[in-house]
């Protein structure tokens, strides 16, 4: 069914879309009495290899694995009444072609199982996917085929011709684009991941959730588009869309249309698909279109995130607007705030994703707001215990945060932000026409105390301090924040406790950050949330988990266990938000797992053990690797990398001007040739004319390495090698008198190191990078074990 006639009455049109999405073949096995031949495998034997299942045949794959490829129905469409059923427990590893006259029901089984290959293709036939099913390789639809997905998981959906896909449940990931005019995707339930491109086809949404859609025609009556949808024709009458790109043949059906707060009719244009809005390089404020769709869902579109080019506004009768105050409690979900409404989100309550609030009061008092909140001429209040997701956009609204957590990428345009507590994630944008007030104390600009009420922030400035509730904060361009002028309101702060803080599985009141002089240790079962910030502190990670959005300033972090940051694959790590280690901080990695780390401005990372996903070394940063496993390392200008041992990944050096990479080991090879004239104790700079080569050898701890070096595009990048005569011996914990054994003669030297405040690796019995009272118990345990 091709949905092009935009003049059909709205209610009838929506009904037709729903009917089409529900018109699929029954997602169940047919009665075997309707077939001349019925094959149940097992127990029946059937040779699947390269065979064609002909007319009036039902094949039931009940259990086991079938690796062969086969065709269901003749390629010319002359066969009829054919059915293949793949039941739970069955795995079909080959490629299946469902031609005209055939039906394939995947009833909990697997097709194209992992590492077996094989696609499932509806070439004029019908394929039904139900709960529990998994389609690992491509699920293709072409040549008039139909695919109905009511459950299960489809990893690679691919429309390659004139076909229809109906999604009423399950999870579907896109694989390829379709250029067919007659390709149709109908979604009423389920989740669609990735980008679905139907440049000449049609997308009809009445429910469910999708991420990105490109289509010639889009007809939306419900559901959620969490990222973006682009179309050149269609009708938008409901649902929620995070970002849109619509042109002149698209109709917005609803009412209460306002452009920049003024009534608007006819057609409207704002934003451009070909432009990027930057609040600091513009001549006028962003345009904002608000309204309510025909289903009663409010919307907010702006020239910041959306593009509308001569889109038609169609006014219809809207559902009544109840302005009675609404409390959203446990288990309750709200999907939009219309003019004059007051919504209060209590603990357990939820504001759903891509929620739009227009002329609304929204109080979050312990509840949760999902990603993509959009505010227009509204008031948002966030109190302690609340969570607001990422990507909140505020236009002409007042945002008051006194507690809780607001996710990254909060944008405030031509409104106000008042921050007195809680925490806000990275990427805060305050439009020059908006005002921001921070209530608290201990304010510093680039580490220097300030008392002036108004502060202007340059491109490289960092503003830090403590909010009125005692939570430390920092805003800087290097963390993605964009602020020009901020008003600071000084108030008395709660005292910062100097008692060491332990966070484990039993901890209830977990701090949102650390103030100067505080010490925190994360033990097994402990967990620190997003956007944790620490200034002038000691921060120990012995177990548990710490978020990757942690920021460290003028502090020492010792990781001897647990997980510090997100642990991902190399490809995923490229898009991960890094841990920030800055302003003369020290990161010691002795054990445990560490994610992506960005280190700069006089800070040093020492890696002697554990696993570190990736280092990004910024200006003034230094990384020393003596052991453990380190992933890729990217160097920028004015940086130092010293490698003594352990293993490490690829070095990215193209931006490493005025930097140095230094290797220490027992022997070195240049492009496979031994450097045999390097004396023990000698340090040699490799000739600057060597721009593309491989350096290999044995590091000082005995680890072998081979590292391609490319410095063709750098200026003054020095590569040095230092030869030592023997492999370094591992540290013997507890052997403080360095006699090669641990016994009671080590007690007095241990006490001397402890009281002096000095560092000796043998006395660091808890391996957290410092010697203090925390080493007493493990030292006693070592002695007791003798």
Predicted features by range, described:
Residues 184, 398:
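Cationic, beta-structured binding surfaces that engage anionic biopolymers and membranes
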Residues 11-21:
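Bacterial N-terminal signal peptides
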Residues 22-28:
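Sec/Tat signal peptide C-region and signal peptidase I cleavage site
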Residues 44-47, 59, 65-68, 77, ...:
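Extracellular beta-strand scaffolds
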Residues 50-54, 69-80, 96-101, 120-122, ...:
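Extracellular beta-strand-rich solenoid/capping regions of secreted or surface-exposed proteins
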Residues 29-32, 38-39, 43-47, 54-59, ...:
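Cellulosome-associated attachment modules in secreted, modular CAZymes
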Residues 2-12:
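Bacterial N-terminal signal peptides that target proteins for export
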